[in-house]
């Protein structure tokens, strides 16, 4: 798909022309900052800059933290305490890094759900969406391995439980688990591997972010209406767009400042609110915590993992059909990874010709029920797997898969969309034009 017509950088001085012929970096920066952006973007589109800030924060604080960290089972916990007590500003660096991960995931979940609501995955933006899902998977892997590094009780037992999932794969599971751990159990080789990968993956994420930005700069940004920018000429495109600089940069920086006020308040006044007290106890393989839970951003999928027990009829059916090869544990692993995979497949599961949920009356109800379902699964994932909680988790898991595999494909067939604006300019004038906001 051709890019949006716009003015490109033209070198004016002799030096600029000389540099442009050899390294057109000024042109690259100009085209990035001055890219035409739909003028009707709302606050849902501010989270990109929050994500960029979080990535830079995590890499910067992480680099300093590893200068003082020792990846050895006998020294890791003590080295973290050394950072907290003896390194100048060490406690602040650690709290920024830990809470920065939470802000990172909060922003990415809002970013994903915004994309699901406004149809940012639909053609021609499928590649942008898939690269975004790859970034999310890399974030999950990086965060999990980072959670193991402090070598507290929850770090150790969380690693034991999650790596144990690979052992559920029939036939080759135990061999894969041993290969991942570097031995029969979570120990020093595991810690060293996780430390190395935790340091490496943020740079892989940064590279994928560049590809992600490149992809949506090629196709153009989506917008609340889902209507494409007119591309017949520069004049037409200018009626639907504004340059990214200064309009959206200033808006995004203001939004980032508001988010950071809340973020630094949490870091300064309740930095351990989202953590777990058991992780301030050094790892002990002989003492199992009463309740093993991952970080909050993994809880929805952890709830799905635990929801499918041996007494669930669908598990019993699959177990019987597979001649006992797929047991409840392996079924839970499939369900957990499948819950993430269906989000990557949503460009082909959504059959509606209308991109934005703003004009889909039936879709809105099912979508917001999905958002509630996600929060409920997060809550259930933090609860013990007893009493009514497994039933709630099972119901939440069922709706999650039903939404993507049944409801979304059917809605595109049966739903009658509302009237849509023909252009972004029309939508913008309807909301922000002089008729809408008359001068006083």
Swiss-Prot record:
Alphabetically sorted, this entry's keywords are: Cell membrane, Electron transport, Heme, Iron, Membrane, Metal-binding, Respiratory chain, Transmembrane, Transmembrane helix, Transport
Compartment annotation: Cell membrane
A single GO molecular-function term is: metal ion binding
Q: Which residues bind heme b b562?
A: 97, 198
A cellular component term, taken from the record's GO annotations: respiratory chain complex III
The positions annotated for binding heme b b566 are 111, 212
Pfam families (UniProt xref): Cytochrom_B_C (PF00032), Cytochrome_B (PF00033)
User: What are the recorded Gene Ontology BP terms?
Assistant: respiratory electron transport chain
Q: Where does the sequence pass through the membrane?
A: 46-66, 100-120, 129-149, 156-176, 194-214, 253-273, 296-315, 330-350, 365-385, 394-414
For whether the record's keyword set contains Membrane, the answer is yes
Q: Which residues form a coiled coil?
A: none
Q: What does this protein do?
A: Component of the ubiquinol-cytochrome c reductase complex (complex III or cytochrome b-c1 complex), which is a respiratory chain that generates an electrochemical potential coupled to ATP synthesis.
Miscellaneous notes for this chain? Heme 1 (or BL or b562) is low-potential and absorbs at about 562 nm, and heme 2 (or BH or b566) is high-potential and absorbs at about 566 nm.
Family statement drawn from the similarity comment of this UniProt entry:
Belongs to the cytochrome b family.
Query: By what name is this protein known?
Result: Cytochrome b
């Amino acid at each position: 798909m051709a890019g949006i017509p716009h003015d490109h950088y033209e070198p004016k001085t002799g030096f600029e022309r000389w540099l442009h012929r050899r390294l057109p970096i000024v042109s690259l920066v100009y085209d990035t900052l001055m890219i035409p952006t739909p003028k009707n973007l709302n606050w849902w589109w501010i989270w990109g800059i929050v994500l960029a800030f979080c990535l830079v924060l995590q890499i910067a604080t992480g680099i300093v933290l590893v200068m003082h960290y020792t990846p050895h089972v006998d020294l890791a916990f003590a080295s973290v305490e050394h950072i907290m007590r003896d390194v100048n500003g060490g406690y602040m660096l650690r709290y920024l890094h830990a809470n920065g991960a939470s802000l990172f995931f909060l922003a990415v979940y809002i970013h994903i759900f915004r994309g699901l609501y406004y149809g940012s995955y639909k053609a021609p933006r499928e590649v942008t969406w898939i690269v975004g899902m790859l970034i999310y998977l890399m974030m999950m892997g990086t965060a999990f391995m980072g959670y193991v590094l402090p070598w507290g009780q929850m770090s150790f037992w969380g690693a034991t439980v999650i790596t144990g999932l690979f052992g559920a794969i029939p036939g080759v599971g135990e061999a894969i688990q041993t290969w991942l751990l570097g031995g029969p159990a979570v120990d020093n080789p595991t810690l060293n591997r996780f430390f190395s990968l935790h340091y490496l993956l943020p740079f892989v994420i940064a590279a994928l972010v560049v590809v992600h930005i490149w992809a949506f700069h090629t196709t153009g940004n989506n917008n609340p209406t889902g209507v494409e920018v007119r591309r017949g000429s520069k004049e037409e495109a200018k009626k639907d767009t504004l340059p990214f600089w200064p309009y959206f940069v200033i808006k995004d920086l203001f939004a980032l400042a508001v988010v950071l006020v809340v973020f630094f308040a949490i870091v300064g006044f309740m930095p351990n609110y989202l953590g777990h007290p058991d992780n301030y106890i050094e790892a002990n393989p002989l003492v199992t915590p009463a309740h093993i839970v991952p970080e909050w951003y993994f809880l929805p999928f952890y709830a799905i993992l635990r929801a499918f027990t041996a007494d669930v009829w669908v598990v019993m059916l699959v177990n019987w059909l597979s001649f006992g090869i797929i047991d409840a544990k392996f079924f839970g692993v499939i369900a957990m990874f499948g819950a993430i995979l269906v989000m990557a497949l949503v460009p082909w599961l959504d059959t509606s010709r209308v991109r934005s949920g703003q004009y889909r009356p039936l879709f809105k109800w099912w979508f917001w029920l999905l958002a509630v379902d996600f929060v409920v699964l997060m809550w259930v994932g933090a609860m013990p797997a007893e009493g009514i909680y497994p039933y709630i988790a099972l119901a939440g898991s069922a709706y999650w898969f039903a939404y993507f595999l049944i409801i979304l494909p059917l809605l595109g067939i049966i739903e009658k969309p509302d009237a849509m604006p023909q252009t972004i300019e029309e939508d913008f004038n309807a909301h922000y034009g002089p008729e809408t906001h008359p001068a006083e």
